[in-house]
Amino acid sequence: MEHQQLRKYVELYNKEVEEFYNGAASGRPAEFHPSKVHVKSIHEKAGTANAGVEISSVGVDWDSEEKNTFFWCLSRYSIHRVDEWRSLLPRKSAMEILGYYRLLRRASASARSRKAGDDGAPIAYEMSAEWVALETKLSETVMAITEGAAEVADEEGHCEGLIDYESWKRRWVAIYSHSRIAEIRPLPRHALPLSRSATQTLERCVSRYTRTLLWCTALAGMASRSVSARAAESRGHKSLPTVVTRRQVERALCTEARSRDLHVLPRRIVLTLRKWELDYPREGKLFRTKEMAHLFLQSQLSRRDAPPVHQDENQENQENQENQEQDNTASEGESEAERDEIDEADLFRSALHENQLLKWLSK
């Protein structure tokens, strides 16, 4: 019996949360009847007019779903931000929404001016002590289950793993909780818990990313390494020590980011700012190191065409000469050293000024 009560309590809570975030789209029953709204307080319910009276065609039709959406947006945003949520009512203009709001305000003021009796008022129910005790018990049970799951997640996070979830929690407080997306605000100050399936999915993504990175760094060095015939026949020592430097990792990231859609950390930072609509000072320092900023620019340049740059005649002649020299030596092919060595000056040669490059990237 207690388990069934707890299950229904959780279902009721989840339903309230779904209605709060999704509003009229959550599938709850319609609470309003369709009607025709007119600026002169013509507010007739559909089907309630007398058979002999012709219904006026003047007015705006509001169905139940539109009314549910209207009142939900009014409670979440306010009427002063109607331009932000008007897209949720595609069949209504801003003036029609404001007209409906003013009509409701006049009806509310008129109702306050009259002495209202008890007729038609909803019945007030008083909760018994037994019901209050039951609700308190159910809420404490749900809280205990939630805290137990959080403790298990903390214990798993303290052990050594692929992902540092403590860093994720710190980022949530500093970054994600300040999102300006109206549909998900207000966000809690504490990081949302991750399920076990979500954790496993994230770890698989990290493993695939690391495998791709090792393929471009360690495997390339191992393939070009030569060993003696005696060492090749020996089966006692199976490991082959390989040193991977930071420069090799940076070159691999740049190469893979240009050849295919490999997400690098600086690019993920920018995508996060756009996805969560976060404000950040443009004159501030977005990346910690200069290498991360260069890596971001390289990844962006690989996904776009070259920015238009105004050049004079001397620069054009110089570039034509360089292109001719490159055409003469192109038949020899690119050597392995040229592919490994990424010259940053060549990547930014088309941008004469830093302001032009940044202005082009911000489009």
Swiss-Prot record:
Stretches with biased composition (Low complexity): 317-328
GO cellular component terms given for this protein: nucleolus; nucleus; RNA polymerase I upstream activating factor complex
Location of the region described as Disordered in the Swiss-Prot/TrEMBL record: 301-344
Subcellular location: Nucleus, Nucleolus
Biased composition (Acidic residues): 333-344
Basic and acidic residues: compositionally biased ranges: 302-313
A molecular function (GO) term: RNA polymerase I general transcription initiation factor activity
UniProt keywords, alphabetically: Nucleus, Transcription, Transcription regulation
Domain of life: Eukaryota
Coiled-coil ranges per UniProt: none
GO biological process, one term: transcription initiation at RNA polymerase I promoter
Subunit composition and interactions: Component of the UAF (upstream activation factor) complex which consists of UAF30, RRN5, RRN9, RRN10, and histones H3 and H4.
Protein purpose: Component of the UAF (upstream activation factor) complex which interacts with the upstream element of the RNA polymerase I promoter and forms a stable preinitiation complex. Together with SPT15/TBP UAF seems to stimulate basal transcription to a fully activated level.
Protein name, as recorded: RNA polymerase I-specific transcription initiation factor RRN5
Organism: Saccharomyces cerevisiae (strain ATCC 204508 / S288c) (Baker's yeast)
